[in-house]
Amino acid sequence: MSEKVDVGESVKGDASENAVKEVAERPIVMIDNYDSFTWNVVQYLSNLEKRYPIMVFRNDEITVDELEKLNPLKLVLSPGPGHPARDGGICNEAISRFAGKIPILGVCMGLQCIFETMGGKVDSAGEIIHGKVSKINHDGLGFYQGIPQNISVTRYHSLAGKISSLPDCLDVTSWTENGVIMGARHKKYAIEGVQYHPESILSEYGKEYIQNFLNLTAGTWEENGIVMPTKNNAFNAAMRENSNSVSSTKIRKQESILEKIHAQRLIDIAESKRKPGLSVGDLQTYLNLNIAPPCINFYERLKQSKPALMAEVKRASPSKGDIKLDANAAIQALTYAQVGASVISVLTEPKWFKGSLNDLFVARKAVEHVANRPAILRKDFIIDPYQIMEARLNGADSVLLIVAMLSREQLESLYKFSKSLGMEPLVEVNCAEEMKTAIELGAKVIGVNNRNLHSFEVDLSTTSKLAEMVPDDVILAALSGISSPADVAHYSSQGVSAVLVGESLMRASDPAAFARELLNLSSSEISNGKKTSTPLVKVCGTRSLLAAKTIVESGGDLIGLIFVEKSKRKVDLSVAKEISHFVHTTNRKHISPKKAVTGQSWFDHQYENLASSPHPLLVGVFQNQPLEYIRSIIAEVNLDIVQLHGQEPFEWIHMLDRPVIKVFPLNSSEISRPNYHIVPLIDAYVGGESGGLGKKVDWEAASFIPVSYVLAGGLTPKNVQDAISVSRPAVVDVSSGVETDGKQDLEKIKAFINAVKEL
């Protein structure tokens, strides 16, 4: 019979049928290799895991068949004396039986059992270590997720896996300062072990390491929802060729720049995951809450232009060093968007490229208001789904997947994961074999890097050589070494649909002009900010059908109906409905056709919509009134636009099913905030009140407003031309200036509109 031991819910097993029957839930099973440290490990397990029983069996007192009947949830192999082949009891057989079925953890001899079972050899470590504390570094993956570097661990061993026999299915996970291997992990199965003792009081982060093991629920990394990044194999290879005493310095000298970046990104990812609020679970929660901004179709956005420009934000690179360290990602991205870039590529790798996730975030925010905005690409060394979640949450529409860095299995997993978040990846290749892999993957956007990532040498013929392999429905992009219109023309002639330009744009004294040159665009095709055409006319305070007809017949563009209770200009609801019917069945006298302009800002685009409306636009004016009241008037009168003339919250704008004009004082910092109001209305404020007061705005100061805006306050038929000349508004708004004795004067309305339209 099993007996209870004083370690939480653990039981010491005797493998009898009764013992098996006693376990109602699936247990975590510890195989005890006759070592006193076994119970320290068990204590950690029982303190960390309260949901399932923990059963301990000596390695020669239970068979694997009997163990299988227990249907264990997880398997732990304890430390122990001797050699795993001679003294490990059922450990090796148990590993073989349960590999890929349940998570397995090996400690000290337990690791040696894993090593030997997978085809490696265990031999003398060259020294006897007993209670020695060493510093180790690790890869930040698997059970090391969220654990910092350079931690202290306690070692008790005289044997170790012979690294020259390291099985291909295992990866080195941790090592001492002088290169002695301290951990290994199976590449596919959720099997991992350490040579040191995480349960020792002198070992740092032992509980965290064991907790990561306990968090697993399945026998493979993939089933646990973990895409294990391709490891940097330079360390493994060097250790096979040398003894355990090979130094990490010697190993690093054999690494290519790509391998160095790869290794550093593994460390960066691990450090990010352990920050409060940035764990994998946290990021998944944010995605589930739909916190990520909307995503556009990367493939379709590229198809809109040929050639499509993928303009890059890049401060530095390993091959060129510093390029433009003071570059502001937001300004750079907006500049690219305004000249018609289809994609903004943002380097986020911090050490060699001097980028950051913040660059990605601000680049997206900067172009969010641009009409038909460019897609945002996170360009980085993507090796972990965590990076893809980061990208989506920070506004990316696509991520870069480099075939040279990933195994076929990992490439497929990351590709599918990106697609599951709505992002079509850009798959990068450098040779025919990689191109074949990308095509078989089903990639819709394939980029050829003319730069070999191992040597960083550029061969501009690489793209040309691979172009003929690409199916017709796949977008082919040239990703490097492009610095002139001639390069763009050359690739376009060979079927390349998109070009990525980074360094040349970053170094250009006038990036906008250089981008226009690359795309062969004239300056007239580029959005250049504020409108300089004849302003639209809005007559506010209209409260009769006759006045509305006069406005339309005279060429007015917008009719303002005031629904503010205390206003002397409040319109009767029945009259408002009559005016609405008339307005929506009458064509405007002056209609401005939409222009084919690249990279329009939010406000320019909204102005174009106003100017091109086929009928006059009906504007309902409200001031500090309930949201539901405004909604009811919108529905009853069929308003085209809502004008908020009070202190209404910005968030209301997205709750109203109509475009919104919002009033601001001249000194407001919110005037040019995009994605909310379609145009700001600038009015004079007297005693905190605005609208219909007959007070003028400072026209000279208004001329510096950087976006299309509505000018109101003190305008009359006599001064409106001067006001327009000085302040350059997109729309002029009049109410008291076309009244006589408090009533709308039809002749003044005609005179005001004519004065504007004859400019």
Swiss-Prot record:
Q: Identify the stretch(es) annotated as N-(5'-phosphoribosyl)anthranilate isomerase.
A: 536-759
Q: Name one GO cellular component term.
A: cytosol
Please list the reactions this protein catalyses. Answer: N-(5-phospho-beta-D-ribosyl)anthranilate = 1-(2-carboxyphenylamino)-1-deoxy-D-ribulose 5-phosphate; 1-(2-carboxyphenylamino)-1-deoxy-D-ribulose 5-phosphate + H(+) = (1S,2R)-1-C-(indol-3-yl)glycerol 3-phosphate + CO2 + H2O; chorismate + L-glutamine = anthranilate + pyruvate + L-glutamate + H(+)
Question: Segment Indole-3-glycerol phosphate synthase: which positions?
Answer: 257-519
Q: Which CDD domains match?
A: GATase1_Anthranilate_Synthase, IGPS, PRAI
Pathway annotation from the record: Amino-acid biosynthesis; L-tryptophan biosynthesis; L-tryptophan from chorismate: step 1/5; Amino-acid biosynthesis; L-tryptophan biosynthesis; L-tryptophan from chorismate: step 3/5; Amino-acid biosynthesis; L-tryptophan biosynthesis; L-tryptophan from chorismate: step 4/5
Q: Which domain of life is it from?
A: Eukaryota
- Biological function: Trifunctional enzyme bearing the Gln amidotransferase (GATase) domain of anthranilate synthase, indole-glycerolphosphate synthase, and phosphoribosylanthranilate isomerase activities.
Q: This chain belongs to which protein, by name?
A: Multifunctional tryptophan biosynthesis protein
Q: Which organism is it from?
A: Schizosaccharomyces pombe (strain 972 / ATCC 24843) (Fission yeast)
